[in-house]
């Protein structure tokens, strides 16, 4: 419902480069274009009572059908609805979805969307966490950004994306740049040693140390997978 929000995020992120260089295409559809009546109504009160407003099925259906036409049909197309009911979005899922050729995002608003739209069109629901936002543009763009940055050619170095937090199953290690000393705190000597094996060992130790301290849930999962894989 708020195309300007999406365009602003695209134009001020790596997504702009992806679009400019023809790596990806974005088509932003304004749900208001399919609204009913002089006021272009797109929401109404829920049947059965309750607070909040629900995005109506008819405008959504028309907008989705237009999107399906723009991407070339339903075959092989993922239709994603960011929702607290969905699978938790993760780096693993982002990596998998970065291989997709056609994705349609439905951005919810208000209390939610008519359930009949979910039943008819949505192929995947993803959650970015156990909290509620006022608009679906934010989670949709979060999901999109995490996918697109993994497509070859989007980042200057794909290695940068592959060595961020989580591909190791761990948080990322600390990073340092110039100057060597800031407020009497120096860069660890090992990073200046030029000894590749020692540097890699330090990075691995710091990833493990940071994950164990800051994300015990990830640490537990990491140990479980490590033991399972021998």
Q: What does each of the following model-derived ranges do?
A:
Residues 1-71, 196-218:
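N-terminal nucleotide/polyanion-binding subdomain common to many enzyme families
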Residues 27-29, 80, 103-104, 124-126:
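Hydrophobic/aromatic beta-strand patches that form the interior of the parallel beta-sheet core
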Residues 31-34, 109-113:
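Short glycine-enriched loops at secondary-structure junctions
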Residues 51-54, 88, 110, 114, ...:
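Gly/Ser/Thr-rich beta-alpha loop segments that engage phosphate groups in nucleotides
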Residues 56-109:
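S-adenosyl-L-methionine/SAH cofactor-binding core of RNA-modifying enzymes
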Residues 113, 117-164:
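Structured adenosyl-cofactor binding patch, chiefly the S-adenosyl-L-methionine
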Residues 138, 150-189:
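Internal, active-site/partner-interface "lid" segment
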Residues 179-230:
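SAM-dependent methyltransferases
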């Amino acid at each position: 419902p708020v195309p300007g929000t999406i365009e602003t995020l695209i134009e001020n992120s790596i997504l702009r480069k992806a679009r400019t260089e023809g790596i990806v295409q974005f088509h932003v559809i304004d749900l208001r274009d399919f609204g009913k009546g002089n006021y272009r109504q797109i929401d109404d009160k829920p049947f059965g009572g309750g607070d909040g407003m629900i995005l109506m099925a008819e405008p959504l259906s028309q907008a989705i059908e237009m999107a399906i036409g723009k991407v070339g049909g339903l075959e092989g197309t993922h239709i994603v609805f960011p929702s607290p009911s969905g699978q938790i979005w993760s780096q693993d899922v982002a990596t998998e979805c970065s291989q997709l050729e056609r994705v349609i995002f439905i951005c919810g608003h208000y209390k939610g969307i008519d359930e009949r739209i979910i039943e008819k069109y949505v192929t995947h629901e993803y959650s970015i966490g156990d909290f509620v936002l006022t608009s679906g543009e934010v989670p949709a763009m979060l999901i999109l950004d995490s996918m697109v940055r993994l497509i070859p050619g989007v980042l200057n170095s794909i290695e940068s994306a592959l060595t961020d937090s989580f591909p190791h199953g761990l948080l990322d290690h600390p990073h340092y740049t110039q100057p060597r000393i800031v407020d009497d705190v120096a860069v660890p000597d090992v990073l200046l040693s030029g000894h590749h094996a020692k540097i890699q060992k330090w990075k691995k130790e710091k990833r493990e140390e940071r994950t164990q301290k800051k994300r015990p849930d990830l640490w537990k999962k990491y140990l479980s997978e490590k033991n399972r894989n021998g």
